[in-house]
UniProtKB/Swiss-Prot annotation:
It is an enzyme of class 4 (lyase). PANTHER family: ARGININOSUCCINATE LYASE (PTHR43814:SF1). Pathway: Amino-acid biosynthesis; L-arginine biosynthesis; L-arginine from L-ornithine and carbamoyl phosphate: step 3/3. It comes from Trichormus variabilis (strain ATCC 29413 / PCC 7937) (Anabaena variabilis). It catalyses: 2-(N(omega)-L-arginino)succinate = fumarate + L-arginine. This is Argininosuccinate lyase. NCBIfam families: argH. It is found in: Cytoplasm. One of its GO terms (biological process) is arginine biosynthetic process via ornithine.
Length: 461
């Protein structure tokens, strides 16, 4: 980096090349270029609107910035490391295009409020894209759920068989996690959508700017009321990273289940060739790389959140160079969440198949219907805690006899308690066990059908 920087006139010697490279951010903040151009166009329009520059100069600046946009999109404008950052790169190219008028663009503006504006414009756009992806993920979950309302799957607590549930009910749990993610992003958006433009370096400006005018042009909901806060606030980025981390938590939990379900020990799903890989040495293998990568990338997003919190915890007001470190983790988190949502949506839609016969067998090979025996007795007047103890004896008797509950004879049942009758067999059948849980939000088929319909309405379908 040999070219002098805009700020270098106060200095007598050039920046050491290694320090210049260390200081530069153009390698990653180029991600903001389209947003920087948009923000600069609004700033130029405001300068003309308030009479700080002439209308003709404002038009020149806006047109020059638009030319840079086209050059960038066509691959003709690719600033190098000598630009230091995207803001200087744009300003330098603008001056080449429109001449000295380009040097007026930065009037009444600092890179501090400029980068804050760019980052908010970027994140606002990315939040909207992620919300769209979440909706598609939810639609795919609902499509599968709709087809599997009466498909049974073992339900687990402590990763031990607990009670059978509807497969649709299980998938709807992830739908509602995604719904909270969607709503949470909307809440974050409100605090992203605040304009710092016009806050200057930290104290505002002596020029008669109109901050509300630029906020309106850029479709910000409101402006920062305090210039110090405006240039130093990164709460919005931390909030986004929190929301992104929760999205990844939910995707990772689903990934973990798919990994288990695809194993030979579970055999609940089959991974299709389009979404699985093989082993370089073991030819029989079909590896669940997609969910494993999602699970692994979750830690990456968590790390960026932790890094941002640590960056911010000791910063005095207002702007500090530490804040340059807010971008790489933010950009990577955005890209990671988007990639994981896309991959998991494809996996669910095209890459796995539930083995319904295996699932049907699985729910008949355990004692997950034991709670229903206690409910059976309680419905016949036996106090639940007493019924609970009786069922413990039933399970103990069954294990000793090498039987499941369904295999006990009526005599064996009645030896344990006289309240048992022939209808006990229907009461403990997996299908009846699921169907009977018809409380609101439960796994009963009627409730799940209603829940699928309600979920469709919730996402506007």
């Amino acid at each position: 980096m040999t070219e002098k920087q805009t700020w270098s006139q106060r200095f007598e010697s050039a920046l050491h090349p290694a320090i210049a490279l260390f200081n530069a951010s153009i390698s990653f903040d180029i991600e903001l270029i389209e947003y920087d151009l948009t923000g600069s166009q609004a700033h130029a329009q405001m300068l003309a609107h308030t009479g700080i520059i002439s209308p003709a100069e404002g038009e020149q600046l806006v047109a020059g910035l638009e030319q840079i946009r086209e050059e960038y999109r066509q691959g003709k404008f690719q600033p190098g490391i000598d630009a230091e950052d995207v803001h200087f790169a744009v300003e330098r190219r603008l001056t080449e295009i429109v001449g000295d008028v380009g040097k007026k663009l930065h009037t009444a503006r600092s890179r501090n409020d400029q980068v804050g504006t760019d980052t908010r414009l970027y994140l606002r756009d990315q939040i909207s894209q992620i919300k769209t992806q979440l909706r598609e993920f939810q639609r795919v979950l609902l499509d599968i759920a709709e087809q599997n309302v009466e498909t049974l799957i073992p339900g687990y607590t402590h990763l031990q068989r607990a009670q059978p549930v509807s497969l649709a009910h299980h998938l709807l749990a992830y739908f509602h996690m995604a719904q909270r993610d969607w709503e949470r992003l909307g809440d974050v958006y409100r605090r992203v959508n605040i304009s710092p433009l016009g806050c200057g370096a930290l104290a505002g400006t002596t020029f008669p700017i109109d901050r509300h005018y630029t906020a309106k042009l850029l479709q910000f909901e409101r402006i920062y009321e305090n210039s110090l806060d405006g240039v130093s606030d990164r709460d919005f980025a931390i909030e986004f990273l929190c929301a992104a981390s929760l999205i990844m938590v939910h995707l990772s939990r689903l990934s973990e289940e798919i990994i288990l379900w695809a194993s030979e020990e579970f055999r609940f799903v089959t991974l299709k060739d389009s979404c699985a890989t093989g082993s370089s040495i073991m030819p029989q293998k079909k590896n669940p790389d997609v969910p494993e990568l999602v699970r692994g990338k979750t830690g990456r997003v968590f790390g960026h959140l932790q890094a941002m919190l640590v960056i911010m915890k000791g910063l005095p007001l207002a702007y500090n160079k530490d804040l340059q470190e807010d971008k790489e983790g933010l950009f990577d988190s955005v890209n990671t969440v988007k990639a994981c949502l896309e991959a998991m949506t494809i996996l669910l839609q095209e890459g796995l198949e539930f083995r319904t016969q295996r699932l049907a067998e699985a729910v008949t090979q355990d004692f997950s219907n034991a709670t229903d025996v206690a409910d059976y007795l309680a419905a016949r007047g036996v106090p639940f805690r007493e019924a609970y103890n009786i069922v413990g004896k039933v399970v103990k008797t069954s294990i000793a006899a090498g039987k499941l509950l369904k295999d006990l004879t009526l005599e064996e049942w009645q030896e344990i308690h006289p309240a048992f009758a022939t209808d006990i067999y229907e009461a403990i059948s997996p299908r009846q066990v699921v169907a009977a849980r018809n409380s609101y939000g439960g796994t009963g088929f009627a409730q799940v059908s209603k829940a699928v319909s309600a979920a469709r309405e919730e996402i506007g379908e």
